A protein has these predicted regions:
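Extended alpha-helical coiled-coil "stalk/arm" regions
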Residues: 22-62, 87-98, 102
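Domain-scale macromolecular recognition modules
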Residues: 73-76, 118-143
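Long, charged amphipathic alpha-helices with heptad-repeat/coiled-coil character
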Residues: 9, 16, 71-106
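Generic ordered-secondary-structure signal
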Residues: 7, 43-44, 129, 143
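Short, charge-rich amphipathic alpha-helices with coiled-coil/heptad character
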Residues: 1-15
Length: 143
C-alpha cells in the first residue's frame, strides 16, 4: 500500500512539474505580446500616417486580447498547480500515516519477541535451578 502512495506522490510531482513548465511557457508568450504592444506604440508615436496608426492600433488590440487569453490560461494553470500541490500533500500524508503504521507494527512485534525471549530465558533459568537442586539433593543422598 505504501508503494502505491509513493508512486502517486511521484506521479503527481511529475504532473506538477509539467503544469509549472506550461505556466512558464504562457508567461513567455505574455512577455512577447507585451513587447509587440510596446513596439506598436513606439511606431504610432513615430508616424503621422493614419493607415499605419490604424494598423498598429489593431495590432495592439490583438495583442491585448491575446494577453487576456494568456492570463486566463495562467489563472487556470495556477488553479491546477494549487490543486496538484494539495493532492501531493494529501498523498505524502498517506505515506507518513502508512509509515507510522508499519513502524508501530514493527515496534509491537519487537516487544512481543523481547517478551517471548525473556519468558524463554526465565524458563531456562528455572529449569537450571531445578536441575541444580535435584543434583544437590542426589549428592546429599549419596553422601
Amino acid at each position: 500500500m505504501i508503494d502505491t502512495y509513493r508512486n502517486n506522490v511521484s506521479r503527481k510531482r511529475t504532473e506538477l512539474s509539467k503544469l509549472s513548465s506550461d505556466r512558464a511557457k504562457e508567461s513567455a508568450k505574455k512577455a512577447q505580446q507585451k513587447q509587440k504592444i510596446i513596439s506598436a506604440t513606439n511606431s504610432i508615436n513615430r508616424t503621422n500616417s493614419q493607415s499605419i496608426i490604424r494598423s498598429k492600433r489593431s495590432e495592439i488590440e490583438r495583442a491585448e486580447k491575446e494577453i487576456a487569453s494568456i492570463d486566463k490560461k495562467i489563472a487556470d494553470l495556477d488553479r491546477k498547480i494549487a490543486q496538484k500541490e494539495t493532492e501531493i500533500a494529501n498523498e505524502e500524508k498517506k505515506v507518513r500515516t502508512e509509515e507510522d503504521k508499519i513502524r508501530k507494527k514493527q515496534e509491537q512485534e519487537d516487544k512481543k519477541r523481547q517478551k517471548d525471549n525473556e519468558k524463554t530465558l526465565k524458563e531456562i533459568n528455572q529449569a537450571i535451578s531445578m536441575q541444580q537442586r535435584m543434583q544437590f539433593d542426589m549428592q546429599k543422598d549419596i553422601d
